[in-house]
């Protein structure tokens, strides 16, 4: 897509926020932060605002929602000097074609089933997602099939999307309506996306937005924590290019439930087992490199070349669990992003098979005292360094985290927002290398080499 507007920042480096004001003075809140792309409603559009934002190195995307005058709104945004358009909702191909022909940059933030995984799109984005955090039912933590508390997360879906697309991935899920959200939940939403290499389009609930614009001291302190985490992630943006490091691969695609939250990838992650998505459409030997186990969710969907990849995988010593027809999860439907009740019951059967297959084997990393956390294991392009993201979904710090990694490492360092990198002691274990982390507050990254 040719960019008619002069963008202040490369699209791949956009750090997006739904901004609640079109007042030029509100831009002061962005100074010194990593935020460089704001999405604003039509009522907030003005040439003065877009000009001031551009002078500050911030791109402004005008939010356009489905309506009969959507194209007119887009042209108005162009006339007012906005950087581009954020199409939020479902639009027909005529709107996309007209914007492209008019050389107006746009991102599409709509249903998961309409996500652009390839082609000329600027980003692959959706506005559908669960609100990350520990799922509670009547104040009691809901149990996952693995026995631990169930954590609502978008990571499985986002990991698949990252593996299936070369585009930047955004998720623009919103806080629960009419709910005052503690700042920790915003941090969890940012971390939930970031550890999968995606970005959450930061969106405030009304109370936070109003207090932020009013410069309420407590809200400003919360905003500082949000921007601190965003800055930390961007300071280490090179980690997005690292490949999945888990030894278990899940062969799955859009038509077998990969766009659904709460499915197999999430179930395995909740067990704290490193897992890598292997999109059927991209299945090749390189994708399976380093994997020792694989789950094929829909064997009937594979073509001959893809079947050959899995045959070679097993010939080279890999273990393959091919699911029966009853294991196949349905493709995502309009308005649905989580498993139906009948499909949830499938997870129990799949879990039992996976548990038998994996036993107590360490598939890259084994974590202890992390019931409120999720992790993601990555390997550097040269294969010499390993990174373990750690995200805490409780509103309180987690102390005394123990990590057992496969492989022999000589150095370990923990990175956390607002703290200097800290070298950690390592010790030999039967599986490879042990590391103890004193505390994880919200988000951390353990780097070993």
Language model regions located:
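Extracellular/luminal ectodomains and secreted, surface-exposed scaffolds of diverse proteins
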Residues: 420-430
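Solvent-exposed beta-hairpin/edge-strand motifs
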Residues: 404-421
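Carbohydrate-binding surface patches
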Residues: 246-271, 300, 370-407
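Short beta-strand-to-coil "C-cap" segments at the C-terminal boundary of structured domains/repeats
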Residues: 447-449
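Glycan-recognition and catalytic regions of carbohydrate-active enzymes
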Residues: 234-247, 258-265, 342-384
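Exposed aromatic-hydrophobic patches
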Residues: 403, 434-438
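Glycan-processing catalytic domains of CAZymes
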Residues: 6-300, 304-333, 337-345, 434
